[in-house]
């Protein structure tokens, strides 16, 4: 399954592809050629590995959540600690890879989109380290929710550009980032933050994020002597999940992706693209998306700024269609409860995104036996969510 996906046209089965205007095709082809050369160059791979170790702080630990495992009384729960990567989330794994590629291709400016701000921070961090200019597009609504991350990006030397159109969230920031890239492709590299967009982005981001699953596979073998029974990760665009799942695709391991059910799947306020969406094209790729009868994209909703994307990576769409990965959805309330439980029992405050995966993992672990194990991708830490959490836990969740 692994080596042939995507095919040479960037297709994961019927999903993926390159649905871009002619004006972008030369930039995409230049990226494809640059990426192909870099990934077989030992010097590039060596530099990437060194930066991941010395700068990002890899490998990240695997933590046995012993208190929660005992409390729930079912399977043993293990956490892959991407929250401990420099800048606080898995996003830096990919940003370092693409940043080094941009430099190698002779680009001196990075442009990115961001939702929760974590990818924007990661891109600004890499730009700073590589001596490049950085412009980050961010929806106005997300800028309000993630004020601290906006300041972090500015402190790192990036210009944060507000996206004022549409729902003023991640989708709109992505549209504006692409628009900017079209007219500045000669000296600018577009650093996409998830496994979305036209080929080769979904494949490239997956390959930079698979370090999560590669490490976890080895760590689980060392710690438990075998593979986990179940792996759970949250899915917005889906890069932490693909990074975790990819090395396990050919193994007998249950894989569960968790989308944001927001205020409930029976309401209009959710971001559960695979659970409730249909096929369509968004940001250069054929995938599942949230759209109305006339093909207009619906506004997604989640308390988590990193999960309210109306599409999903095409490889996730393919894995759902193949029934290799099961996609579930968790409400705001369930995620917030799981977050509080992890903080109280294990002394770890996860990002609200990651708490969606935790909620599903806790539900599943209860139904399993103590000789089974559940591995959760703890994709980020909760520092960025403190304002939201303080409001919700003090004033109550507004349903």
UniProtKB/Swiss-Prot annotation:
Enzyme class: lyase
Disulfide bridge map: none
Keywords recorded for this protein, A-Z: Amino-acid biosynthesis, Aromatic amino acid biosynthesis, Lyase, Pyridoxal phosphate, Tryptophan biosynthesis
Catalytic reactions on record: (1S,2R)-1-C-(indol-3-yl)glycerol 3-phosphate + L-serine = D-glyceraldehyde 3-phosphate + L-tryptophan + H2O
Bilayer-crossing regions: none
Presence of keyword Membrane: no
EC number: 4.2.1.20
Pathway assigned to this chain's UniProt record: Amino-acid biosynthesis; L-tryptophan biosynthesis; L-tryptophan from chorismate: step 5/5
Cross-referenced InterPro entries: Trp_synth_b_CS, Trp_synth_beta, Trp_synth_beta/beta-like, TrpB-like_PALP, TrpB-like_PALP_sf
Cofactor section: pyridoxal 5'-phosphate
Gene Ontology cellular-component terms listed: cytoplasm
GO molecular function: tryptophan synthase activity
Sites of N6-(pyridoxal phosphate)lysine modification: 91
A Pfam match: PALP
Family: Belongs to the TrpB family.
Record note on quaternary structure: Tetramer of two alpha and two beta chains.
Function: The beta subunit is responsible for the synthesis of L-tryptophan from indole and L-serine.
Protein name: Tryptophan synthase beta chain
Protein species of origin: Shouchella clausii (strain KSM-K16) (Alkalihalobacillus clausii)
Lineage start: Bacteria, Bacillati, Bacillota, Bacilli, Bacillales
């Amino acid at each position: 399954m692994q080596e042939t996906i995507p095919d040479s046209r960037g297709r994961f089965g019927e999903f993926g592809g390159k649905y871009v205007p002619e004006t972008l095709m030369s930039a995409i082809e230049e990226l494809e050629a640059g990426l192909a050369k870099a990934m077989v160059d030992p010097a590039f791979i060596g530099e990437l590995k060194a930066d991941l170790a010395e700068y990002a702080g890899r490998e990240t630990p695997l933590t046995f959540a012993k208190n929660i495992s005992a409390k729930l009384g079912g399977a043993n729960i293990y956490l892959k600690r991407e929250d401990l990567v420099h800048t606080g989330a898995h996003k830096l794994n990919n940003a370092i890879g693409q940043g080094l590629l941009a430099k190698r291709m002779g680009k001196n400016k990075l442009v990115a989109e961001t939702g929760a701000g974590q990818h924007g921070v990661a891109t600004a961090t890499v730009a700073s380290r590589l001596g490049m200019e950085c412009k980050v597009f961010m929806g106005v609504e997300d800028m309000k929710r993630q004020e601290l991350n906006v300041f972090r990006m500015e402190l790192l030397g990036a210009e944060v550009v507000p996206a004022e159109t549409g729902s003023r969230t991640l989708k709109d920031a992505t549209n504006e980032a692409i628009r900017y890239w079209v007219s500045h492709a000669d000296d600018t590299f577009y650093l996409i933050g998830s496994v979305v967009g036209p080929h080769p982005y979904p494949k490239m981001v997956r390959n930079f994020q698979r370090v999560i699953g590669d490490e976890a596979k080895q760590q689980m073998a060392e710690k438990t002597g075998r593979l986990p029974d179940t792996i759970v990760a949250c899915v917005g665009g889906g890069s932490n999940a693909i990074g975790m799942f990819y090395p396990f695709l050919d193994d007998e391991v249950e894989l569960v992706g968790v989308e944001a059910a927001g205020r409930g799947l029976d309401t209009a306020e959710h971001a559960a693209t695979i659970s409730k969406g249909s096929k369509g094209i968004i940001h250069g790729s054929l995938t599942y998306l949230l759209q109305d009868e006339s093909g207009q994209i619906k506004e997604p909703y989640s308390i988590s700024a990193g999960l309210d994307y109306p599409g999903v990576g095409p490889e996730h769409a393919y894995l759902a269609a193949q029934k290799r990965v099961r996609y579930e959805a968790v409400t705001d309330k369930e995620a917030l409860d799981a977050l509080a439980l992890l903080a109280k029992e294990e002394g770890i405050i996860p990002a609200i995104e990651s708490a969606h995966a935790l909620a599903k993992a806790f539900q599943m672990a209860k139904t399993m036996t103590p000789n089974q194990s559940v591995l959760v991708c703890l994709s980020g830490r909760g520092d960025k969510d403190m304002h939201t959490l303080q409001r919700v836990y003090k004033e109550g969740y507004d349903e």
